[in-house]
């Protein structure tokens, strides 16, 4: 009977720790990942910098930051996004 109780306790602790680990990963989705792409015109003159989202994110995205500090999630395959990245890279030179 004692070994059955220990086995159940170990299973409970393992289940709790796995649930906690997956919940911690899910909390980052809204902050560091894009859930949708911006569909409007990209204000190239107002862009300051850009970065690619993590490979752990559900959607591959390029995030632009504007001079006002606004973050814009965009589709990396979009031709306007590629043009904006080239513009920002040329500004650094």
UniProtKB/Swiss-Prot annotation:
The UniProt function text for this chain reads: Chemokine, which displays chemotactic activity for T lymphocytes, preferentially Th2 cells, but not monocytes or granulocytes. Therefore plays an important role in a wide range of inflammatory and immunological processes. Acts by binding to CCR4 at T-cell surface. Mediates GM-CSF/CSF2-driven pain and inflammation. In the brain, required to maintain the typical, highly branched morphology of hippocampal microglia under homeostatic conditions.
Which residues belong to the signal peptide in this entry? 1-23
Sorted alphabetically, the keyword list is: Chemotaxis, Cytokine, Disulfide bond, Inflammatory response, Secreted, Signal
Q: Does the keyword Disulfide bond apply?
A: yes
**This protein's GO CC annotations:** extracellular space
Name the Gene3D superfamilies on file: 2.40.50.40
Q: Where in the cell is it found?
A: Secreted
Please give the name of this protein: C-C motif chemokine 17
Cystine connections: 33-57, 34-73
UniProt cross-references to PROSITE patterns, sorted A to Z: SMALL_CYTOKINES_CC
Q: Which family does it belong to?
A: Belongs to the intercrine beta (chemokine CC) family.
Tell me, what is an example of a GO biological process annotation in this record?
Answer: inflammatory response
> GO molecular-function annotation terms?
CCR4 chemokine receptor binding; chemokine activity
């Amino acid at each position: 009977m004692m070994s059955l109780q220990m086995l159940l306790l170990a299973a409970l602790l393992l289940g709790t720790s796995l649930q906690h680990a997956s919940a911690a990963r899910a909390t980052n989705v809204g902050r560091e990942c894009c859930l949708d792409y911006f569909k409007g015109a990209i204000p190239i003159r107002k862009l300051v910098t850009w970065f690619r989202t993590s490979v752990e994110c559900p959607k591959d995205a390029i995030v632009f930051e504007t001079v006002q500090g606004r973050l814009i999630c965009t589709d990396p395959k979009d031709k306007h996004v590629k043009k904006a990245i080239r513009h920002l890279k040329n500004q650094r030179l």
